[in-house]
Each structure stands twice: as C-alpha cells, then as structure tokens.
Amino acid sequence: MATAPRSLDTISLCSTVSSCPDRNGFYGGFQRTDKPKEPLSKAQIIAREKKWLYMIDNWSIYMSKNYKKIRDRCRKGIPKSVRPKAWFYLSGAYLLKKKNPNVYNELLEKPGNPTTIEEIKKDKHRQFPFHEMFLDEQKVGQIELFNVLKAYSIYNPKVGFCQAQAPIAAFLLMHLPAEDAFWVFVSVCDVYLQDYFIPGLEVIQNDAGILEGLLKKTCPPVYRHLQKHKVEPLLYMTDWFLCAMTRTLPWETLLRVWDCFLAEGIRVIFKVALVIIGASLSRHKVRKTCTGLCETLAVLRSPEEHIVEEEFIINNMMRLNLRVEDFQIEHTRQKARRAKQKAQQEAESSGSGNGHRRNMPTL
C-alpha cells in the first residue's frame, strides 16, 4: 500500500506498472488484469441488459414478490453497463437519496471534526494508488473520496471515520457519481456492515467466532489444523470483512462478489472467506507444509491465483452447504459465549478489589 501520493511518473519506476491502464483503469497492482474476459455475444449482453432495466423499472414489485429472481440474476453477474444503477437499487441507496434531498451537498458545506478531517486527508491517497482515478491529489478520485468520507463522518458522528471504510468508498466511486456513491456507502456502513466501524470492533470479533463455527461445519480438517496451530480468525479475516473484500480479490472477482453481497448481505462475505480458507488448506500436502501459525497465515493471506478467480469463488460459494439457519445458530452461540466471557471478566474485575474493569480486546 502506498504511503505517499504518487503520480504516474513516480509509480512507473515499478516494474509491475504499465504505461497504459487496463480495461478497468489500473496501471499496476494485483488488481490489474491483462487477461481477455470471456466475451458474451452481443445478443446475450443486450438480453441481460433489457432484463435488468425492466427489473429496475419495476423494482418494488420484484423486491416484494420475486426477490429470488433478483438474487439469481445477481449471482449470474450484473451487466457492466447496468451495474451502477443496479447497485444503487440493491443497496436501498435510491430510497435514502429520495428521503434526503440535498443532504449530501449540505454535509459538504459543513466543516466537520478537525481531527477526523486530518485523518481522512492522510488516508485518501492510499486507496487504489495504481488506478487512474486516484493517481494523485489533483485527480477527481481523491477529491471525491475526501468528500464522501468527510460527509459520512458528519452524517454519522457515532462512527466518524475508520480507515477500513476508505477502500469501500473508493471502490464505489469507480462505479457511481459521488452523491450516489455516498448513499450506497451509507447503506453499506450502516446496514450491511452495521457497527463494524465502531471503536472496539466488537461485532467483527463476534463474526470471527461465527466464521470459525461455520468452518468447523463446512471443512473439519482445516478447522482442526487452525485450532492445532492456534490460528485465530482475527489474524486473517479482519481485512476481508472490514473492507468487504475490496483489498483482497482480483477485480473481476470482486465485482461479482459485490453483485451478490448487495443482494444477499454479509453472508456472502462469510461464504467467500470460507471458500478461500477451505481451498487454501484443503489439501493434506499443503497443511503438512504449514507447520505453525506463521506458515498457515502466509497461505491464507496470499491465496493461490486459481482460488480467487471469478468462477471458482462464485461456483464454490454457491456449493457451500449452509442455510440461513446455520448463520443464525452460530450468531446465537457466539452472542451467548461473549456474554459469558463478559460476565466472567466483570466478576474477576470485581473480585480484584480495585474496581478496574477489563476492556474487550481491540485490534
């Protein structure tokens, strides 16, 4: 990740950087791709676009009476030309914008918290530094990213600004006008990733326990390996979940995952995580070479290229034998476990005689 603003001249010194952007606007970095995308026929593309446009024109009917059709079409992949509008509707951002006319521009007129503003200024250049929108401070990407993050910090002062939000906002700005991106961002932060960015990160810790429980169900050998070497979920999944995979997956895979994520919610991120973990450590030969915590983390943090390919992730995500009830059961179990831990900590603190209450561990 970059630590200072870079121009194209600066980053061109790196051997992984091209003088021409790829079809998605990347000059370099792991999300650049020079592989040709398998083309659909023009007739197929037009047919899909028409289906989506009709569905969006009748959105409330589909959401109330035929949501399964929306979900299935998202899993198949949203046509590129329709994706911005589809995400705007899938996330519910179109309703937020309708209920809050002119709010985004009004937020931009406000000064904001000085400390938060400085944090945003320091962080904005670090997002997708190899993408044409974010190459330097004068590019529209960095300007709009600052505006969206500043506006949100004022809109939801309870959360303010968290560094993990920045790649999500930048990712959305690559697809949507700034005001629309802001409202999708609000929906993602306040609904899809609700309470993820509150200081203490208690929700992400709870979800780490849920992920561990689901891994035990879906891939017992891998679960046992992680337990044996004391590989805690927070050591490898925090960035995946907090950034909603935006800093983890190749570009085409990320787009497909977000098509599903905005239709089905956080369960999609759980499933993608389970696919990566399971596929990375499913072979006995690989587990045998992972003789400790560090070796195992290295495998999980740098999955093989084929594991994060678009079709592999999507197909294996759909094959996971997980019901909504499985997530609910694990959520209830983790909630009870954390309540018990909290009670024990309070009891220990009370018994120590100094009245000190231990805080939940933070990241």
Swiss-Prot record:
It is a peripheral membrane protein. This is TBC1 domain family member whacked. Disruption phenotype: RNAi-mediated knockdown in the trachea results in a U-turn phenotype in which the seamless tubes undergo a series of 180 degree turns in terminal tip cells. Residues 77-265 form the Rab-GAP TBC domain. It comes from Drosophila melanogaster (Fruit fly). One of its GO terms (molecular function) is GTPase activator activity. SMART domains: TBC. InterPro entries: Rab-GAP-TBC_dom, Rab-GAP_TBC_sf, Rab_GAP_TBC_domain. The lineage of its organism: Eukaryota, Metazoa, Ecdysozoa, Arthropoda, Hexapoda.
